[in-house]
């Protein structure tokens, strides 16, 4: 039964819930805030589909190119680039898709900015909600069935998600679908929704107001500052960077509240599951400092469909050919596993009693000397050179 899957394997893609023909699979959220499947034995008809199709128990094969064309890219629209997490390539590809009458499926924040889920949309308003990375797990319950229905009705769909969610969708549908276009990203690992909610709750308490807008990896102090920017209903603003924000400390440096299975991800590999793969072009050489501060995406063109998507958006993109080695120089998580450094179980126990920042501080503290060295390097490289834009 799928409910006996080990926690360090299950990706939480929720595809087994959608594929079960008798509605026997549901999900239980554990104390780490991550969900895992449960099976109602009375409803289960023992067809075995959940196990046969699970992308964590069976690697989903891909015919995509194992040596894809690699580009550095960004949107030519300054606002789109500013509002996006990297260079805004997702927005331009999805906008062109909507303009041709297609549906987009991706991740949005809940109205209180404390959880995230996958939805299907067709308008620019939908696109504005879907753009931007949310660095914690999105709830995908029902999305596989909804996409399947649209495809059966002859509609075109552009799905974007983590590589394991893309693998789950491909496994659910069973064969390559002409009308389905797939996007994924280089994925370090996904975080616990409970940790993220606790992080926002604490900041709301400190600012005595509820959140109106959250931007992770805000460009206000430059792309490389990895800052979180939060606007509150009372008009106040929170803006902290990689050295001062406890979420970034726990995730970027410690992988402290990441889903357990992400330490042994099956999809950090080539060929990719999706038609296009996006990422951050960290460490890119030969671009101006201004461009680096505005954000630069890496794009892998993994298939003919990927090439079609790029062609459709090309008039709104800056695109230059680069190599895989250049990407690997600055992006270890394309192939490398993210290893958790702090004490994860203690962190989640503490989180039940203490504010988020205290739980991070007490279970993960970076060596002070390393931190000091990184901070001085950052100041020398960016702060003195930074331009306002
Ligand atoms: C959890 C996570 C880890 C990542 N790790 C890396 C990394 O190690 N290296 C790297 O180069 N890039 C990483 N990225 C990708 C990077 O942050 C950008 O999303 C990517 O470069 C595309 O940028 P963009 O500006 O074009 O688009 P954006 O506007 O940022 O892209 C938005 C698209 O991403 C999807 N998305 C956003 N959040 C989620 C989510 N929680 N779950 C599923 N789909 C989501 C949305 O549906 C939307 O379609 C990660 C992204 C996420 C969400
Ligand atoms: S990886 Fe996905 S399909 Fe497999 S058990 Fe976990 S939630 Fe279900
Ligand atoms: S690291 Fe792998 S398993 Fe974890 S969310 Fe990303 S693609 Fe899925």
Regions found by a protein language model. Name each.
Residues 42-153, 327-343, 349-357:
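Flanking helices and flexible, charged tails adjoining ferredoxin-like Fe-S electron-transfer domains
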Residues 170-181, 200-205:
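Short, surface-exposed basic-aromatic patches at helix termini and helix-loop junctions that form
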Residues 100-103, 208-389:
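Long, compositionally biased charged/polar accessory segments in the mid-to-C-terminal portions
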Residues 2-9, 15-32, 36-38, 48-66, ...:
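Iron-sulfur cluster-binding cysteine motifs and their immediate structural context
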Residues 181-202:
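Short, flexible loop segments at boundaries between secondary-structure elements
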Residues 1-7, 38-42, 244-253:
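Short, intrinsically disordered, charge-biased short linear motifs at domain edges
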Residues 85-88, 111, 159-169, 189-191:
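Gly/Ser/Thr-rich loops at beta-strand to alpha-helix junctions
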Residues 8-22, 45-57, 162-168, 257-270:
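Local cysteine-cluster metal-coordination motifs and their immediate loop/turn environment
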């Amino acid at each position: 039964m799928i409910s006996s899957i080990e926690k360090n394997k299950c990706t939480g893609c929720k595809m087994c819930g959608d594929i079960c023909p008798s509605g026997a699979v549901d999900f239980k959220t554990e104390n780490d805030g991550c969900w895992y499947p449960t099976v109602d034995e009375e409803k289960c008809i023992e067809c075995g589909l959940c196990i046969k199709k699970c992308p964590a128990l069976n690697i989903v094969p891909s015919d995509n190119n194992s040596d894809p064309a690699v580009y550095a890219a960004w949107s030519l629209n300054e606002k789109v680039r500013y509002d996006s997490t990297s260079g805004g390539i997702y927005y331009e590809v999805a906008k062109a898709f909507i303009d041709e009458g297609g549906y987009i499926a991706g991740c949005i924040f809940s109205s209180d900015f404390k959880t995230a889920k996958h939805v299907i949309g067709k308008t620019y308003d939908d696109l504005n909600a879907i753009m931007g990375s949310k660095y914690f797990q999105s709830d995908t319950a029902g999305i596989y069935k909804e996409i399947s229905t649209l495809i059966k009705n002859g509609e075109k769909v552009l799905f974007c998600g983590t590589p394991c969610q893309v693998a789950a969708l491909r496994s659910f549908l069973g064969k390559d679908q002409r009308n389905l276009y797939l996007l994924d990203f280089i994925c370090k690992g996904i975080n616990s929704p409970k940790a993220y909610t606790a992080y926002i709750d604490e900041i709301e308490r400190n600012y005595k107001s509820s959140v109106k807008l959250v931007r992770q990896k805000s460009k206000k102090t430059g792309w490389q500052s990895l800052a979180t920017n939060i606007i509150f209903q009372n008009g106040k603003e929170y803006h902290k960077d990689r050295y001062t924000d406890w979420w970034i400390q726990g995730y970027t440096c410690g992988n402290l509240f990441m889903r357990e299975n992400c330490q042994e991800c099956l999809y950090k590999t080539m060929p990719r599951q999706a038609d296009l793969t996006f990422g951050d072009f960290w460490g890119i050489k030969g671009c101006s400092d201004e461009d680096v501060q505005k954000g630069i995406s890496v794009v892998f063109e993994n298939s003919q469909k990927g090439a079609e998507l790029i062609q459709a958006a090309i008039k709104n993109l800056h695109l230059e050919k680069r190599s895989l080695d250049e990407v690997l120089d600055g992006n270890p998580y394309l192939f490398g596993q993210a290893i958790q450094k702090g004490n994860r179980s203690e962190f989640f126990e503490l989180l039940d009693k203490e504010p988020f920042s205290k739980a991070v501080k007490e279970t993960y503290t970076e060596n002070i000397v390393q931190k000091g060295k990184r901070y001085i390097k950052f100041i020398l490289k960016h702060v003195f050179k930074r331009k306002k834009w």
